[in-house]
Every structure is written in C-alpha cells, then in structure tokens.
Amino acid sequence: MAIKMRLARAGAKKKPFYQIVIADVRSRRDGRFIENVGTYDPNQNPAAVKFEEGKALEWLGKGAQPTDTVKQMLKTAGLWEKFTTKPA
C-alpha cells in the first residue's frame, strides 16, 4: 500500500482551504484519508501553513511520500531538514 502526504481541498466555492492528509494513492483527492497532519489556508496573507510536527515526522519515517507542493511546505516549515538529518 503506497502512502502519500497530500492536500485535500475543503472550504466553500471560491474560498479554498486545504487539509494536509496522509492517504492511500488509490483514494480520491478529497476522499478517504488515514490521518490529518496539518492545514493550509491560501486566503490569508501570507498563506498560513500549520503542521502537527510529531504526526508529520512519524508518517515521513514510516515511508509516506510527500507531493511536490507538500514537500515545499515542509521545507518552509523546517520539518524537511529535521526529517533528512539523521542523528549520529
């Protein structure tokens, strides 16, 4: 079972809001997901990105592959560096 960390759209028409979720690659964009690990609100200026750090790092450690957009968000939040640096 391949797992992705990706965006799931929520919110009203013309007012998008996204949840950052862990989902099976076979499920639809806004369909079934395993766990919610954060949010992204592009309506705020600047756009608000919030991660639950423990959950996000746990799923990355389990092998969840982030999409390109989520990977950039992880880098901006500083979580990608925490994941890629291995303790000595």
Curated annotation (Swiss-Prot):
Transmembrane segments: none annotated. GO terms for biological process: translation. GO terms for molecular function: structural constituent of ribosome. GO terms for cellular component: cytoplasm; small ribosomal subunit. Keywords: Ribonucleoprotein, Ribosomal protein. InterPro entries: Ribosomal_bS16, Ribosomal_bS16_CS, Ribosomal_bS16_dom_sf. It comes from the Bacteria. PROSITE patterns: RIBOSOMAL_S16 (PS00732). NCBIfam families: S16. Belongs to the bacterial ribosomal protein bS16 family. This is Small ribosomal subunit protein bS16. It comes from Geobacter metallireducens (strain ATCC 53774 / DSM 7210 / GS-15).
